[in-house]
A protein has these predicted regions:
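A cross-family phosphate/adenosyl-ligand binding-site feature
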Residues: 1-122, 126-217
Length: 217
C-alpha cells in the first residue's frame, strides 16, 4: 500500500558500489516506513568490506531484498504505489546513468520511475573530487526534481564517535524524506529565552555546538 492507504511510506533503498555503506545500514535501522532494499553486485561487496555485514544480516530490517538485476519488479513500474527511492551510497556512474535516462538495473530503473511519477528521489553521492560531468549530471537531476546529497557529514554537533557522525548525516536523509530527524542544529536555542548571540562559548558547547555564534554554510 502507499502512504495514503497504509499510513506508512513505501521506500526503496538502493545500495551501489560507492563507499558509504554505513550510511545505508544506519538508515535501514531507523525503521522509517515499509522499506525495501536493492543491492548491486558491488554494493554487496562494499557492504561486507565496510560493515562486515552480509545481505542476510539486513533481512530483519526490511520487507524484502531484491537483486539489482530484477527488472521484472514492482518498483520498475509507476503503476505501483511507492513514495520514495533513496540510493545510498550512490556512485558517480549510477548518477550518470539516471541523469541520461539509462534504466538497465532495478536501482536505476526505479529512480527513473520516481522522476517521471514526481516521487521523491534522493541520491547520496560519495566521490571526491567530482569530475565536471558529475556536477552537470547532478544539476540535471536537481532540475528534474531529485535531491542530490553529497556524502558530507556534519561536525557542528561535535561527534565523539564514528557512529555519531554517521547518525548525524543520516538525520539529513531522514529529514529530506519528510521524517523527524533525531537531532537538529541549534534546536535547543528555539526553546531558550536568551538569543544565541548572547551565549558564551561554554553555553553554546553545552547545547552541542562548538561556537554559539557560528552559522552553517
Amino acid at each position: 500500500m502507499s502512504e495514503a492507504v497504509s499510513g506508512k511510506k513505501r521506500i526503496l533503498i538502493g545500495v551501489t558500489g560507492a563507499s558509504g555503506a554505513p550510511y545505508a545500514v544506519a538508515l535501514l535501522r531507523r525503521q522509517i516506513g515499509d522499506v525495501y532494499l536493492a543491492l548491486s553486485k558491488w554494493g554487496r561487496m562494499v557492504l561486507r568490506e565496510e560493515t562486515g555485514l552480509r545481505e542476510a544480516d539486513l533481512e530483519p530490517l526490511v520487507q524484502k531484498i531484491f537483486s539489482d538485476q530484477d527488472l521484472a519488479n514492482p518498483f520498475s513500474s509507476g503503476s505501483n504505489a511507492f513514495d520514495a527511492v533513496v540510493i545510498v551510497p550512490c556512485s558517480i556512474t549510477t548518477m550518470a546513468k539516471i541523469a541520461t535516462g539509462i534504466g538497465d538495473t532495478l536501482i536505476t530503473r526505479s529512480a527513473l520511475v520516481a522522476l517521471k511519477e514526481r516521487r521523491r528521489l534522493v541520491l547520496v553521492v560519495r566521490e571526491a573530487p567530482w569530475p565536471t560531468s558529475a556536477f552537470e549530471n547532478a544539476a540535471r537531476l536537481s532540475r528534474d526534481g531529485a535531491v542530490v546529497i553529497p556524502a558530507s557529514p556534519p561536525f557542528y554537533h561535535v561527534p565523539e564517535t564514528l557512529e555519531e557522525l554517521v547518525e548525524q548525516f543520516v538525520d539529513k536523509i531522514v529529514g529530506v524524506l519528510g521524517f523527524e530527524p533525531r537531532r537538529k542544529w541549534r534546536e535547543e536555542v528555539l526553546e531558550s529565552r536568551r538569543p544565541a548571540s548572547e551565549m558564551s562559548p561554554e553555553e553554546g558547547h553545552a547545547l552541542g555546538i562548538s561556537d554559539a555564534d557560528a552559522e552553517p554554510d
